[in-house]
């Protein structure tokens, strides 16, 4: 039985003070109810230290939204895995659709980041997903399979990798893939992992759904056989909503 994982991606929201307050509210709202699954929050870089201190001692994990694939150097505006590790991050989100869309990340640069995260002793959340055009043209299976293959190129052991399926057309739009649509793609992803790493690895890998998950639809989505939790955007900015989603996974 795969242990479900729910991560709140706060994106570019909340000041440090607001982030600290929200983190405290999340811990309080969850109480000890998330022990059956993993729950994490991904604040902005400036808030990582403060949020990390706030959630210390709780079961809530600290997650980073991105990283660079070099250890250090002349890379203005970037943050290394060593810096994130020192702050206590357990996971790093890699290849989010917004990073691919707005900042030109490719499967190749995603792959470099995945390897760097694993080498630093953290776990990676590999994001994959199709656009509306790719969905409507029927290319979504090929697109997602290519992203999985490219992101994991040269990665021998995927035990520290979570895959997040995020239909780009359902992120921040209020639209949600039906539970059946989401399950279909999650199964495609699991089959691709089986092709690359074998059935035992495919059975063990956790695949999150990330596309406008809300308290009202979380339980139905998480009941699907190949959906192992969620990567939560907007709903993660309200402690009670996020806690309700986590509890739906537990």
Swiss-Prot record:
According to its UniProt entry, this protein's organism is Chlorobium phaeovibrioides (strain DSM 265 / 1930) (Prosthecochloris vibrioformis (strain DSM 265))
Q: Which reaction does it catalyse?
A: D-glyceraldehyde 3-phosphate = dihydroxyacetone phosphate
Provide the protein's localization.
Answer: Cytoplasm
What is the designated name of this protein?
Answer: Triosephosphate isomerase
Give the coiled coil ranges. none
Gene Ontology cellular-component annotations: cytosol
List the catalytic residues. Answer: 96 (electrophile), 166 (proton acceptor)
- PANTHER family named in the record: TRIOSEPHOSPHATE ISOMERASE (PTHR21139:SF42)
The Swiss-Prot or TrEMBL record annotates one GO molecular function as: triose-phosphate isomerase activity
Instruction: Fill in the subunit field for this protein.
Output: Homodimer.
All disulfide bonds of the chain are: none
User: Which of this chain's residues are annotated to bind substrate?
Assistant: 9-11, 172, 212, 233-234
Q: Does the keyword Cytoplasm apply?
A: yes
């Amino acid at each position: 039985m795969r242990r479900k994982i729910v991560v709140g991606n706060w994106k570019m929201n909340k000041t440090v003070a607001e982030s600290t307050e929200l983190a405290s509210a999340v811990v309080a709202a969850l109480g000890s109810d998330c022990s059956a699954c993993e729950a994490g929050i991904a604040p902005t870089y400036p808030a990582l230290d403060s949020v990390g201190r706030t959630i210390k001692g709780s079961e809530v994990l600290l997650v980073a939204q991105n990283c660079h694939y070099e250890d250090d150097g002349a890379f203005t505006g970037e943050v290394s895995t060593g810096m994130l590790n020192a702050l206590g991050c357990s996971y790093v989100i890699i290849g989010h659709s917004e990073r691919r869309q707005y900042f030109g990340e490719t499967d190749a640069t995603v792959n470099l980041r995945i390897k760097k995260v694993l080498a630093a002793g953290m776990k990676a959340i590999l994001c994959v997903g199709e656009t509306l055009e790719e969905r409507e043209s029927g290319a979504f299976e090929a697109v997602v399979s290519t992203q999985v293959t490219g992101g994991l190129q040269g990665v021998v052991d995927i035990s520290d990798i979570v895959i997040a399926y995020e239909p780009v057309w359902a992120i921040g739009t209020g639209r949600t893939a039906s539970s059946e649509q989401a399950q279909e793609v999650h199964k495609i992803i699991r089959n691709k992992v089986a092709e690359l790493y074998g059935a035992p690895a495919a059975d063990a890998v956790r695949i999150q759904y990330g596309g406008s998950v809300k308290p009202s639809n979380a339980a139905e989505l998480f009941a699907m056989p190949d959906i192992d939790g969620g990567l939560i955007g907007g709903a993660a900015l309200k402690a009670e909503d996020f806690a309700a989603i986590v509890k739906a996974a537990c």
